[in-house]
């Protein structure tokens, strides 16, 4: 059994912290020296940022998680999971899939990681279908306009 089966779901990432709660996390990081703050303080702040409704906050959260991933081998699996969620929220589904794939590759029996990967893949498929529908609608509109113009040119 994996040691990260207690992590939040994607749905949990949409429960934003209050501005006051997020500021407390930010102040903790600053009081510890900012970039040299403890991994735990930066991690808590990063997760609070990812949960935000503001895309810029989310991007900063993903950046902090990326830094933590690089700096702390002990937090890599956890960082991958949270990075996948952060990228998912930002609509960066290809990156979310990369992180989820990496996590599942290391922990194939982790049910939460597999569920996260499946959700990301479902979103990619849904977005792909929406894109195909938009392209199809665009092509139909162009064909209709071309047909109309060709009829107008006939004497």
Swiss-Prot record:
Transmembrane segments: 131-150
Membrane topology value: Single-pass membrane protein
Pfam families: Fis1_TPR_C, Fis1_TPR_N
Cellular component aspect of the GO annotation: mitochondrial outer membrane; peroxisomal membrane
A biological-process GO annotation: positive regulation of mitochondrial fission
Localization terms from the record: Mitochondrion outer membrane
PANTHER family to which the protein is assigned, alphabetical: MITOCHONDRIAL FISSION 1 PROTEIN, TETRATRICOPEPTIDE REPEAT PROTEIN 11 TPR REPEAT PROTEIN 11
This protein's domain notes: The C-terminus is required for mitochondrial localization, while the N-terminus is necessary for mitochondrial fission.
Protein name: Mitochondrial fission 1 protein
Organism whose genome encodes this protein: Eremothecium gossypii (strain ATCC 10895 / CBS 109.51 / FGSC 9923 / NRRL Y-1056)
Lineage: Eukaryota, Fungi, Dikarya, Ascomycota, Saccharomycotina
């Amino acid at each position: 059994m994996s040691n990260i089966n207690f992590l939040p779901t994607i749905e949990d990432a949409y429960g934003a912290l209050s501005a006051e709660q997020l500021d407390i996390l930010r102040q903790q990081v600053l009081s510890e020296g900012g970039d040299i703050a403890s991994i735990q303080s930066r991690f808590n702040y990063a997760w609070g940022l990812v949960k935000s409704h503001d895309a810029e906050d989310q991007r900063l959260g993903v950046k902090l998680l990326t830094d933590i991933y690089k700096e702390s081998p002990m937090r890599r699996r956890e960082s991958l999971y949270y990075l996948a969620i952060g990228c998912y929220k930002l609509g960066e589904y290809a990156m979310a899939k990369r992180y989820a794939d990496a996590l599942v590759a290391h922990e194939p029996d982790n049910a939460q990681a597999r569920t996260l990967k499946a959700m990301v893949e479902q979103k990619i498929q849904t977005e792909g279908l929406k894109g195909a529908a938009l392209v199809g609608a665009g092509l139909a509109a162009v064909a209709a306009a071309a047909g109309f113009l060709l009829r107008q040119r006939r004497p």
